[in-house]
């Protein structure tokens, strides 16, 4: 008797645990209820031939009959569809000749129709990477050789878990040169400290890419490469060449450096002190946050951690996109989407509009939606609620209850306490919800125990999340912001930047390239104005920073020619044209200049970074930089510095 992998898995569970509920089988097989019923039916038909049945009793299923006959069962080595798609793609990438339909049928034990369907799905997905399928005498992948190699590295990274990769367990992918892969692992990891922090999956990708050196001749790399990427690539290839006893061409080194540059070096979260960075990527992340905020009417820009999470998530998934995933897995992200349908729809449409084709997968939309949904739940700044707590308990008991409420619902901005006897019906107009530690006649007041157990806390969490999702309009008291800090070094750096800040109109030439030297002439804090003008223009050519649809451009650098770090704004008498972050022409009427001394203090660098992030990441602040006068922007800078210092204090 032959069983599929899923049937064998279920049978083994019956043998190990005896009785299984439907929910246990769903969790075990990670499939839908319908698929479980079908698997039970198919397994029952197979077991009936050896006088064994599956019986249901009191919501549980178990085996009865001649159980000794189970020894005669043979499992069939079958694959789920996503496993087949990955393995067929792997074979197409590794093969230099065509693979026939018959060969694939025989290897995967499936029909001609199944292979045709699989090939159609593979062809559609690989078109996202600009690869096509040649169907002469079988199937063969055709496309740019660099893309083929990169796709192979992505596919292997998708299919080898971090633990399996670390242990050298490559499963169905043993065709790789295992010794070369282990050597690449050692060399890359020993030099990894020269790179910025990398996700474990990103490291795995670059190790595999290094091990694939020499696989298919690569094509010339056409764009400039940063010194940091080139130095690292030369270092690892020197050692790799020595230990493999193999010569690698300069094109191999340049290709590896170009991928490292694109995915890591130019995509650092703090771009201010990097001469080259991917300005389009930065703009896309902030643009996504801005557009989601616009269409949902929720100001996600207030969550200071959302940009960080999205930046790192999308950076990794652009580097190692999922090619074929297990669609039967119901992830946490999928469950979150069910309660945030509109948010998911908005995110999906915007990701399609902003990011490349190969990122366009439903699981990716769900994960990005999860980041926005988590932002709602995480921060009292985004979509806060205000609670009135009615209680006669002692201060310690009430403080403990408030702490537990804020733990399960961080989006609670404020909990105001009143005695039960002081409650008035009009109080409901000032709060999103009212809780009481004793039952009241008013049905709108929710009863909560002074010391709620875990079950009640979960119910309260669901209730508060529902209150947040369906907020009513309330009368809010005017709040005063208390600002204060005692970090002397940051205070001194703040004073210096505010003193050096200036705003002026300049009678500039008619083009951007000649306007920059004109601006430099006005800055006393620069010792070599010609040199710095040239450096700023070179940096701008590599990483353009005209901000789309704002008429703003940002010039920034750190240099030994800067005497005093400063931030200055220039209104141009004549508009000029400059390249924007998304590499389109932008009419510029105002230029922001950030100059940092080469040996500047950490405190000053932190504050300069805060300014750059406010310009690039926060569209509300960008609007102020675009239209504000000197006094308004001065106050904005003061606010940014204060927020930075308050964050450091806490």
UniProtKB/Swiss-Prot annotation:
The lineage of its organism: Bacteria, Bacillati, Bacillota, Bacilli, Lactobacillales. The PTS EIIA type-2 domain may serve a regulatory function, through its phosphorylation activity. Not necessary for mannitol utilization. May be involved in regulation of the mannitol phosphoenolpyruvate-dependent sugar phosphotransferase system (PTS). Keywords: Kinase, Phosphoprotein, Transcription, Transcription regulation, Transferase. It comes from Streptococcus mutans serotype c (strain ATCC 700610 / UA159). GO terms for molecular function: kinase activity. Its EC number is 2.7.1.-. This is Putative transcriptional regulator MtlR. It is an enzyme of class 2 (transferase).
